Amino acid sequence: MSCKMGNFMNLRVFALLGVLLLAGGSGLSVRHLPSNPWKNEASQNIQMRYLAFQYQVIPVGNELGIVAEAYPVIDKLPDWASWYGEIMLSVYVSDEYGRVLASKDTVLVPRPLNREAGLPLEVSLDLGTNRHQPLSISFGYRLVLTD
């Protein structure tokens, strides 16, 4: 009986070590999201399923300012949707492999869904020593639409 218990404990220790190794080596990745290379002060667009982002990147020292508006993709929204119940917009700065180097989430107050008006987003991100490598910008969002 003690031999079986010892094997079970060894198995649990190895399983725990495996989980810790996987968790320690994993970082946030945005490879699955559309992205654009970082361009200073040029107006750019990223189209996603329900929102289209128009944005501009403004570097200030080691910080990166991003001013954006997220417009609803009208033909993708359900006809009954008339209100943003919850809105969280995210900005990600990633390296050439899609690894996130800096990010910021912004929660907006609920509001009527105006199909022609954009949702405002303005963030500042500290890039530290990463400023001098090829960088990309991506966006994410969480929307809860109501009627």
Residue ranges of each PLM-predicted region?
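Short amphipathic, basic-aromatic surface patches that mediate peripheral association
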Residues: 69-81
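Sec-dependent bacterial lipoprotein signal peptides
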Residues: 1-25
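Short, solvent-exposed, Trp/other aromatic-anchored flexible loops in extracytoplasmic proteins
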Residues: 99-135, 144-147
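Bacterial Sec signal peptide processing site at the extreme N-terminus
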Residues: 23-41
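Short coil-to-beta strand junction motifs in C2/discoidin
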Residues: 80-89
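Short, compositionally biased P/S/T/A/G/V-rich stretches that sit at domain boundaries
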Residues: 35-58
